[in-house]
């Protein structure tokens, strides 16, 4: 009988020990018995689970440390960056709109509100649970 080679993919490959054990998944009699096969399978699945768990926790611990990217410049202000019109700073609205005197150039109030709400929703970190 030919040698049985088991290909280890994905997370099981992270644990080289079980991978090796899977490669040598045949007995001395050149045959793969169901017993060794199942044990190998169980070991592999356990290894995969452990690896995935450690990975997710690792990533979860990393999430807080990612620096936030600098805010994009609003697409509508008249002057330079956020909220610079020719108005005095006290009269200026949010950085998303450019205020000149009392006249505001930019999206309407409702639109702005909706945008803010969307932005708030987007901030939650997404972590897959295994």
UniProtKB/Swiss-Prot annotation:
Its main location: nucleus. GO terms for cellular component: nucleolus. Residues 61-130 are annotated as: Disordered. GO terms for biological process: negative regulation of ribosomal large subunit export from nucleus. Keywords: Nucleus. It is found in: Nucleus, Nucleolus. Residues 109-130 have a biased composition (Basic residues). MINAS-60 is the product of an alternative open reading frame (alt-ORF) of transcripts coding for the RBM10 (AC P98175) protein. MINAS-60 and RBM10 ORFs are overlapping and are formed by shifting the reading frame. Interacts with 60S ribosome assembly factors GTPBP4 and MRTO4. Acts as a late-stage inhibitor of pre-60S ribosome assembly by preventing pre-60S ribosome export from nucleus. This is Ribosome biogenesis inhibitor MINAS-60. It comes from Homo sapiens.
């Amino acid at each position: 009988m030919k040698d049985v080679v088991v290909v280890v993919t994905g997370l099981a490959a992270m644990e080289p020990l079980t991978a090796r054990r899977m490669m040598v998944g045949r007995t001395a009699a050149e045959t793969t018995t169901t017993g060794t096969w199942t044990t190998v399978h169980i070991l592999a699945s356990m290894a995969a689970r452990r690896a995935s768990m450690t990975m997710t926790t690792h990533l979860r611990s990393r999430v807080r440390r990612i620096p936030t990217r600098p805010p994009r410049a609003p697409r509508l202000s008249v002057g330079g960056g956020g909220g610079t019109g020719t108005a005095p700073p006290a009269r200026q609205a949010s950085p998303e709109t450019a205020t000149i005197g009392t006249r505001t150039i930019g999206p309407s109030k409702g639109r702005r509100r909706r945008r803010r709400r969307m932005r708030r929703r987007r901030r939650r970190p997404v972590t897959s649970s295994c």
